[in-house]
């Protein structure tokens, strides 16, 4: 098992409801370390670049609007098989289908406002981290 990093965003629905501490507790209880964290207001340009893979999807505009509607918390998480572990901890995209104890089961309001984003691969984690963090921002 390899130590790796993954990227996380606590979305505007989470920050609006002051869930940062509660979500961080679930992350840390799962054995992941938060080695980088910043609360930011994502710009339209940042959101469009970040979700570029969904540009042709019908929900793209709504997604960009949502992600820029309030502060988000961007994070770098580190641990054994961090990408897979965090995806398990997040739970299914649809909170109704998420397993008990997962972030989305506990906190998500809907498929669209599902509290968190997590990288889907180690390669994407590197790209996503680089969009929001310099190496000097990460303290392992």
From Swiss-Prot:
<comment type="similarity">
    <text>Belongs to the NDK family.</text>
</comment>
<dbReference type="InterPro" id="IPR034907">
    <property type="entry name" value="NDK-like_dom"/>
</dbReference>
<feature type="binding site">
    <location>
        <position position="93"/>
    </location>
    <ligand>
        <name>ATP</name>
    </ligand>
</feature>
<dbReference type="GO" id="GO:0046872">
    <property type="term" value="F:metal ion binding"/>
</dbReference>
<feature type="binding site">
    <location>
        <position position="104"/>
    </location>
    <ligand>
        <name>ATP</name>
    </ligand>
</feature>
<keyword id="KW-0067">ATP-binding</keyword>
<dbReference type="GO" id="GO:0006241">
    <property type="term" value="P:CTP biosynthetic process"/>
</dbReference>
<keyword id="KW-0418">Kinase</keyword>
<keyword id="KW-0597">Phosphoprotein</keyword>
<keyword id="KW-0963">Cytoplasm</keyword>
<dbReference type="Pfam" id="PF00334">
    <property type="entry name" value="NDK"/>
</dbReference>
<dbReference type="GO" id="GO:0005737">
    <property type="term" value="C:cytoplasm"/>
</dbReference>
<keyword id="KW-0546">Nucleotide metabolism</keyword>
<keyword id="KW-0460">Magnesium</keyword>
<dbReference type="GO" id="GO:0004550">
    <property type="term" value="F:nucleoside diphosphate kinase activity"/>
</dbReference>
<dbReference type="GO" id="GO:0006228">
    <property type="term" value="P:UTP biosynthetic process"/>
</dbReference>
<dbReference type="InterPro" id="IPR001564">
    <property type="entry name" value="Nucleoside_diP_kinase"/>
</dbReference>
<comment type="subunit">
    <text>Homotetramer.</text>
</comment>
<feature type="active site" description="Pros-phosphohistidine intermediate">
    <location>
        <position position="117"/>
    </location>
</feature>
<feature type="binding site">
    <location>
        <position position="114"/>
    </location>
    <ligand>
        <name>ATP</name>
    </ligand>
</feature>
<keyword id="KW-0479">Metal-binding</keyword>
<dbReference type="GO" id="GO:0006183">
    <property type="term" value="P:GTP biosynthetic process"/>
</dbReference>
<dbReference type="GO" id="GO:0005524">
    <property type="term" value="F:ATP binding"/>
</dbReference>
<feature type="binding site">
    <location>
        <position position="59"/>
    </location>
    <ligand>
        <name>ATP</name>
    </ligand>
</feature>
<feature type="binding site">
    <location>
        <position position="87"/>
    </location>
    <ligand>
        <name>ATP</name>
    </ligand>
</feature>
<comment type="function">
    <text>Major role in the synthesis of nucleoside triphosphates other than ATP. The ATP gamma phosphate is transferred to the NDP beta phosphate via a ping-pong mechanism, using a phosphorylated active-site intermediate.</text>
</comment>
<dbReference type="InterPro" id="IPR036850">
    <property type="entry name" value="NDK-like_dom_sf"/>
</dbReference>
<keyword id="KW-0808">Transferase</keyword>
<feature type="binding site">
    <location>
        <position position="11"/>
    </location>
    <ligand>
        <name>ATP</name>
    </ligand>
</feature>
<protein>
    <recommendedName>
        <fullName>Nucleoside diphosphate kinase</fullName>
        <ecNumber>2.7.4.6</ecNumber>
    </recommendedName>
</protein>
<keyword id="KW-0547">Nucleotide-binding</keyword>
